[in-house]
Amino acid sequence: MSELCPCGSILNYHECCGPYILGTQVAAKPAILMRSRYCAYVEKNVDYLIATWHPDCHAQEWRESIIQGFTKTVWHGLTVIADTPGRHPDEAFVEFIARFTDADNAQITAMHERSRFLRIKEHWYYIDGIRPSLGRNDTCLCGSGKKHKKCCGR
């Protein structure tokens, strides 16, 4: 039986993000790495997340914190908004919205980020991200249809 990939593509997991997480393929584009990292969060695969963080981040130091985060979070979906080049060929940005539920709050919440990726020797790595500002009167990203100030922005 085939299983759709959690990243939101219409592909089977083993034809989409699975090969990247298993290490049999290398993500050729930052958006692919972004999607596979989302799947790693869904699967609670700390090793893949650490391996795809830029070496300057020293992500291995956060291993326990990442694992603790897994116990509190259920992921509900990913929407990639934009995939844009950076200032040089080895930099790129991926803007996305990821929906999740935290154990401390039963309501679906959304995380909106513009992630920055750097390439080292044909491998892309996540280095950091910024959260674009959302006005209180904007529609909430979680998909509720409510204004941000009446929903996740409280």
UniProtKB/Swiss-Prot annotation:
NCBIfam families (alphabetical): PRK01617.1, PRK01752.1
Pfam families, sorted: SEC-C, YchJ_M-like
Residue pairs linked by disulfide bridges in the UniProt entry: none
Top-level taxon of origin: Bacteria
Species whose genome carries this gene: Yersinia pseudotuberculosis serotype O:1b (strain IP 31758)
Signal sequence interval, chain numbering: none
Entry protein name: UPF0225 protein YpsIP31758_1970
Coiled-coil stretches noted in the UniProt entry, renumbered to this chain: none
Stored InterPro entries: NTF2-like_dom_sf (IPR032710), SEC_C_motif (IPR004027), UPF0225 (IPR023006), YchJ-like_M (IPR048469)
